[in-house]
Amino acid sequence: MTETEDPWGKLGQWFPEITDTSWTALRQYTSLLREWNGKINLVSRKDMDRLETKHLAHCLTITHFLRLMPKAQILDVGTGGGLPGIPLAICYPQARFTLMDSIGKKVMVLEDMVEKLGLKVQFLKS
C-alpha cells in the first residue's frame, strides 16, 4: 500500500463483516492511541505510520473466524497499547474483556481510552 492510499478503505475491504459503529470506534481508538503514544510509548513509534495496516489489521484478522457467545470472557495478557484487546472489545461488545499489563502507566492510559470509547473493559496490573 502506498502512502497516498486510504488505510481505512483497505481495512473495510479486508473486513467487510465489521459494522459501521465498530469502524467509528476503531477510528477513535487509533486517534487516541496516536495521541497518547506521543506521551508514553504504547506501540513502537516506528510503526505508527502503519498503525492501521500493520497492528489493527493483525488484530482484526481473527474476526473472520471467531464467534463469541454472549458474556464470553477474554483475557489479553501483555496488552501494551491495548492491542488486540481494545479492537476486539469494540468488535465483540457482547463479550467481557480483561486487559493485563505489568506497566501501571500503560494501564492508566488504557483506562482513559476505554472510558472515552464507552467500552466496558476491565484491567489488571500484573
PLM features per residue range, with description:
Residues L60-S126:
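Conserved SAM/SAH cofactor-binding pocket of Class I
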Residues T2-P70, K105, D112-L119:
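Class I SAM-dependent transferase core
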